[in-house]
Amino acid sequence: WEQQDIHLFLERCHWETRLWVDDIEVGMQNALGAPHQYDLSDVLRPGKHTLTLRIDNRIKDIDPGENSHSISDHTQGNWNGVVGDMYLQVRPKVNIARTIIYPDISDKSVRVKTILRNRKKSQTTALLALEADGKRMQKKVTLQPGTNEVDAVLSLGDEIRLWDEFHPNLYQLKVSLTDEEQNTTDSREESFGMRDFKVVDGCITVNNRPVFLRGALDCAAFPMTG
């Protein structure tokens, strides 16, 4: 793990977390709808360390109301802690931090915004490649130290498979990053659907077809199992 990025991943927290490495405070995160991720690269050194995590479920910045279904005693309860995956993740110094996919059914392509992180102290060059459904494109990028944003468009050919509730076709996008020595330093895969979602004359449409949405509210009403 030497000379690598190291992150702590916490999948579902309720809901404010604060982290220390030994006696050094790393930071605080406060979110219900997304994992908490801490970058430990600058505070970890070879050797033994103690990670201390404090979970605070008091009603403060996030206030759903005392009788909301997420925290009231007669439904879910105001639980405290972390559930799901909790692990340390090692990443290369030049890595793919995030990918955001924008389908374009009229152009039969996807625009991919890729957030690349260069934790080296100097500028570096790399080759960014996108591949889906047998189609591939690559782009040479120059990365400054820190966070870099790269836009690229991948054409999917003349025949595309649209996504909707009756035909939930999905594509798999592979994003890879290759260094100057032709070594793949990082890669990730994301799934996406080719669909157009908009509002026309007050109606929601998917691929230009009106859709009607409905939901169900169960209120945690399962007395035998909680």
Language-model regions, residue ranges each:
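Hydrophobic beta-strand positions in extracellular immunoglobulin-like domains
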Residues: R12, I55, L88, I101, ...
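Short, aromatic- and glycine-rich surface loops/edge beta-strands on solvent-exposed regions
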Residues: T50-L53, H167-D179
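Surface beta-strand/loop "capping" patches
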Residues: V90-K121
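Active-site-adjacent substrate/metal-binding segments within catalytic domains
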Residues: W1-L10, H14-D22, G27-M28, Q89-I100, ...
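Beta-strand-rich binding/interaction modules
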Residues: V21, S109-L143, N148-A152
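Exposed aromatic-hydrophobic patches
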Residues: H36-D42, N148-D158
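Extracellular and select intracellular beta-sandwich modules with Ser/Thr-enriched
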Residues: V82, M137, T184-R188
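Accessory beta-strand-rich segments of carbohydrate-active enzymes
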Residues: W1-N95, R119-K120
